């Protein structure tokens, strides 16, 4: 399992596993040690010039931190100060969630995480055929579980016979980069470079290229229209999917501008001591097409709508752009009725999004 998947597994474990009991109060001396470890870790922040500003911010408020004895309040204050300068939602200091920072999850913990992820459908909220032979897949997150690829293949198999596909990432906050790459791989016939990850380790830059997979477990979805739904709640790996598909002209992006989180922590969490840990992004995604990314700006949709209207808008486009693979009187009538009243055809999906 990669470091990124391990980090995501830890986040899943936190949903149902209590972290090791730790005192809720910290002494000024302990705060000094925590801050020193944080300052050291900030040296590998993805942007060196910002790293210096972050360190200056933390040093400037050291005396204020020493006056905070509540561990949760200290973690919140450190996070607030880091984000005020870095404008990076991945910059986080946590207390009581250090599980897995210094050691791999145990076998029992992994089994619990697998059971939780299985019960949650590996993040796949829905995979179905909509009226008019349009596919719809709703992904709440990109699961790090070893069976996530199999679940994704099953979803893609179900929609493989549709004439156009809508992938709903409006509620997707990210997750496993490997699973996100697996999804992207279904939409390309040939192995394609999607991006590069430029990271810093010990102050030195290192670049790794990201390509689509040469093999996917289900049928590829090529030669047919694809629409990606995004919103302000779309983050990280979900934004990566939207950004890559937009820039390769493989999909039409519909909805709101996304959250704007392109930086990543390729090394996982950093232990700060006394139950504290920090997520310090040391990597950034870089497109070979734009030579940039979506950090701070979000992914701009091709078709701008509100989040709640995105599905209807994409559905109309899909019905219009799709080339029917099979002609029949029944399918023709179904498409015509869907175009006349797409909201009625999508009542279940629209209601579900607005309620959540």
Regions found by a protein language model. Name each.
Residues 5-14:
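Bacterial N-terminal signal peptides
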Residues 292-356:
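Low-complexity, Gly/Ser/Thr/Pro-rich intrinsically disordered linker/tail segments
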Residues 124-149:
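STAS-typified acidic loop motif
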Residues 46-132, 328-356:
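Extended, small/polar residue-biased N-terminal targeting/export presequences
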Residues 97-101, 141-145, 171-177, 193-194, ...:
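Solvent-exposed loop/turn segments at secondary-structure junctions
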Residues 17-21:
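Boundary at the C-terminal end of the N-terminal hydrophobic targeting segment
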Residues 175-225, 263-272, 280-284, 288:
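Gly/Ser/Thr-rich loop/hinge elements
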Residues 38, 82, 137, 167, ...:
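Terminal peptide-recognition signature
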